[in-house]
């Protein structure tokens, strides 16, 4: 594997944050400097965490996932007051979801290792599985290439329930068939059988979406020391009850903090991402198997426009009795993470970084400082045949990332013809229409009754010219079919659906192509934190 860095244009908060713009950096409590990380360690030492209870839960949970010895030792290390975490999170996508989930985990592992060495304290990697998520449409699919098209392949569970990812039971046979259909779209390789077995081993041990995700990730990173946590695990929810109570008692201050910080963001010229009602409580409650967002209504906590209503005392009582019924929204999830873990750094994608910039005053309302927010590592893989296609078309590796591939294709095609087809036909139509306009005027003067027919005649002539143009373009494309197919392959591989590769393709394709140790080989690489995009030639 050969790794290169390229500068890819970014926009908005992420671009300004990485470029060191002071205005946006002031929306975060720590710069990404070594001194700032040292200060973060000192700040965390002044706080108390329920470490032993957390260790007990994480040992049980990660052991159930058949964690490696390095993970078990890292969990135990969390009981020490001088141990901290680097953390990231994601929904429990089937087959682990898009590649960026894997890249987030690699980011967590690398930063934890780097900071442990530079700060001289124990730093462990943690990945937070968003088990409370009820939106199955976000996690129940993957993309494949089929019949020279990119196809979204959805897993249709025959017994769907309106439950969280932690509670939604998987129909194992249905899921197994879905996985087999996906692998049929991959080339048969020496690794296919082993990868299918690898996936099926995880599936057989799983009852829910989160189980399947957790087992797959743990098997993939079994020797890395990665700690997994299911954010909606009933035992974890019990530990979170005191903080849920705190949120309920301070929800007005939380909403005010969010509003004030969003005003700051607006003044800096950015558009806020988080949308909430002014009476939001920022907590979900599970009612009749549905995740209901609570709102304030004249001192009562209501859901679904008043369909459900609770007094403060009733809500607190229910939290103590059934904590697993409660979960956080986009505003309070980072707060809960901060409450549970001694977080040295949070790693997020571009969208997460943008919405965290809106939370600074929310953190302060609770008495927290926002942890250092580190943009995750971004990666694109270039297979050998794609590298050959780029070379044959005289394209640089950076070109598909800096330009629209369709535009590159059009430019290349135009260069194969002495005079651009579009320009020549525009000129021809203009000349012909000028002549025809004069001709119509002549016809109208002699016989006004033929005016309508003359107009139709103009339309027909235009239609025939456009048909000729289309036929010419089609024949030119057929003549250069080999080269144009190379552009299509480049687009599918590097910019599928016009998006970054890591937002569309799944890691199983690469495991099938390069073996079960593919992720291990990627982890051996050293990635920089300078905001540049990493291109790995395979």
Curated annotation (Swiss-Prot):
It holds the Pfam family CC_BshC. Keywords: Coiled coil, Ligase. Residues 460-484 form a coiled coil. Its EC number is 6.-.-.-. The keyword Ligase applies. GO terms for molecular function: ligase activity. It is an enzyme of class 6 (ligase). Belongs to the BshC family. Involved in bacillithiol (BSH) biosynthesis. May catalyze the last step of the pathway, the addition of cysteine to glucosamine malate (GlcN-Mal) to generate BSH. This is Putative cysteine ligase BshC. It comes from Bacillus thuringiensis (strain Al Hakam). The lineage of its organism: Bacteria, Bacillati, Bacillota, Bacilli, Bacillales.
């Amino acid at each position: 594997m050969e790794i290169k860095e390229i500068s890819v244009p970014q926009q908005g908060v992420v671009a300004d944050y990485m470029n060191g713009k002071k205005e946006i950096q002031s929306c975060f409590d720590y710069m990404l400097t070594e001194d700032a990380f040292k200060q973060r360690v000192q700040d965390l030492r002044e706080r108390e965490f329920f470490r032993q209870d957390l260790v007990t839960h994480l040992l049980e949970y990660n052991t159930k996932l058949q964690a490696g010895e390095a993970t078990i030792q890292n969990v135990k290390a969390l009981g020490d007051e001088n141990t901290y975490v680097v953390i990231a999170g994601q929904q429990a996508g089937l087959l682990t979801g898009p590649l960026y989930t894997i890249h987030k985990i690699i980011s967590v592992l690398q930063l934890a290792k780097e900071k442990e060495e530079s700060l001289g304290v124990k730093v462990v990697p943690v990945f937070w599985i968003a088990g409370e998520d009820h939106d199955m449409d976000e996690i129940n699919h993957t993309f494949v290439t089929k019949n020279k098209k990119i196809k979204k392949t959805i897993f249709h569970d025959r017994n769907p329930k309106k439950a969280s990812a932690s509670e939604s039971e998987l129909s194992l046979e249905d899921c197994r068939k879905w996985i087999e259909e996906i692998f049929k779209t991959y080339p048969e390789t020496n690794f296919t059988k082993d990868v299918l077995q690898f996936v099926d081993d995880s599936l057989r041990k799983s009852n829910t979406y989160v189980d399947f995700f957790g087992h797959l990730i743990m098997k993939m990173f079994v020797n890395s020391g990665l700690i997994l946590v299911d954010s909606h695990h009933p035992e974890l929810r019990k530990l979170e009850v005191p903080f849920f109570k705190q949120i309920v008692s301070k929800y007005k201050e939380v909403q005010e903090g969010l509003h004030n910080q969003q005003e700051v963001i607006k003044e800096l010229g950015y558009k806020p991402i988080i949308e909430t009602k002014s009476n939001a409580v920022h907590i979900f409650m599970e009612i009749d198997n549905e995740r209901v967002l609570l709102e304030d209504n004249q001192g009562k906590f209501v859901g679904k426009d008043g369909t459900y209503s609770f007094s403060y005392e009733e809500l607190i009582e229910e939290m103590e009795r059934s904590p697993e019924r409660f979960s956080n929204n986009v505003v309070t999830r980072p707060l809960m993470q901060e409450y549970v873990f001694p977080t040295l750094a949070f790693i997020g994608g571009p969208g997460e970084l943008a919405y965290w910039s809106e939370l600074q005053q929310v953190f302060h309302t609770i008495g927290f400082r926002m942890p250092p927010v580190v943009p995750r590592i971004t990666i694109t893989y270039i297979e050998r045949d794609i590298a050959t296609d780029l070379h044959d078309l005289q394209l640089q590796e950076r070109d598909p990332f800096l330009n629209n591939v369709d535009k590159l294709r059009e430019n290349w095609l135009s260069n194969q013809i002495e005079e651009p087809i579009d320009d020549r036909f525009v000129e021809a139509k203009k000349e012909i229409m000028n002549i025809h306009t004069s001709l119509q005027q002549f016809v109208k003067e002699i016989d006004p009754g033929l005016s309508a027919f003359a107009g139709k005649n103009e339309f027909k002539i235009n239609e025939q010219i456009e048909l000729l143009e289309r036929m010419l373009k089609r024949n030119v494309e057929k003549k250069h079919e080999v080269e144009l197919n190379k552009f299509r392959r480049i687009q599918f591989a590097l910019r599928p659906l016009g998006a970054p590769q890591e937002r569309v393709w799944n890691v199983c394709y690469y495991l099938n192509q390069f073996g079960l140790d593919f992720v291990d080989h990627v982890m051996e690489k050293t990635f920089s934190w300078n905001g540049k995009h990493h291109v790995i030639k395979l």
